[in-house]
Design a protein with these regions (language model features):
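Generic enzyme active-site microenvironment
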Residues: 1, 15, 65, 194
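Short, glycine/acidic-enriched loop or turn micro-motifs at the edges of active sites
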Residues: 4-6, 20, 70, 178
Length: 209
């Protein structure tokens, strides 16, 4: 899973935050600097902000879950995915339904997960046990990517996982960094875990066979 913003010259770059304060100690926004300027930033340990194109090229066999963090990120991410011929190995998503729809419109057939409003509608539909309503809220999607709790509800109860699966989507849970919680969620039947500790997750998956 990775987040994407657009540089000042319209290049998709891998960045979670809209500005560089946390990663580079600088107040500028990502969209105020060109891709070349961002590439010259020293993030320590000889690291820099990679572009989405560089990342897709560096890991040609990997599948990417891409969160479009800004309006400008939509067209730039679509361009990078299309240029890399990577439509079949990415999932594009956003908390914004408008951004999600825009990306899907430009990349027909690309996998996508529920935006914030679509997931909220599906979650509330599970409260009234409205199977048809859950399916309607998630129609055309491939996954829900969710925290363990939302709107004061347990989003990954066995009943809700069944309801989401019945609607034809996978259930991915974020952000899980402890192995006991990874094991618990996988035992409940979730399909994916978003984590900062891929090493720990791989140990859990290997142990489960």
């Amino acid at each position: 899973e990775t987040d994407v913003h657009a540089s000042a010259d319209g290049v998709a770059v891998i960045a979670h935050d809209p500005d560089l304060s946390r990663v580079a100690g600088r107040p500028q926004r990502v969209d105020q600097l060109t891709a070349a300027e961002l590439a010259r930033l020293d993030l320590g340990a000889e690291q820099h902000l990679p572009t989405l194109a560089e990342t897709l090229d560096a890991f040609p066999d990997a599948r990417f879950n891409i969160d479009l963090k800004s309006v400008g990120a939509v067209a730039s991410a679509v361009e990078a995915v299309r240029a890399a011929h990577a439509v079949d190995r990415v999932l594009l998503t956003s908390f914004s339904e408008r951004r999600r729809r825009a990306a899907v419109a430009q990349l027909p057939g690309v996998a996508t997960s529920a935006s914030g409003p679509r997931f909220a509608a599906a979650l509330l539909a599970t409260v009234v046990r409205g199977g048809p309503l859950v399916r309607a809220a998630l129609r055309g999607l491939h996954a829900v990517q969710i925290p363990v709790r939302a709107i004061s509800l347990d989003t990954v109860s066995p009943a809700r996982i069944r309801a989401f699966h019945a609607a034809g989507v996978e259930v991915h849970v974020w952000t899980i960094n402890e192995q006991p919680e990874m094991r618990r969620l996988l035992s409940l039947g979730v399909d994916g875990i978003v984590t900062d500790r891929a090493d720990l997750a791989m140990e859990v998956v290997a142990a489960l066979g």
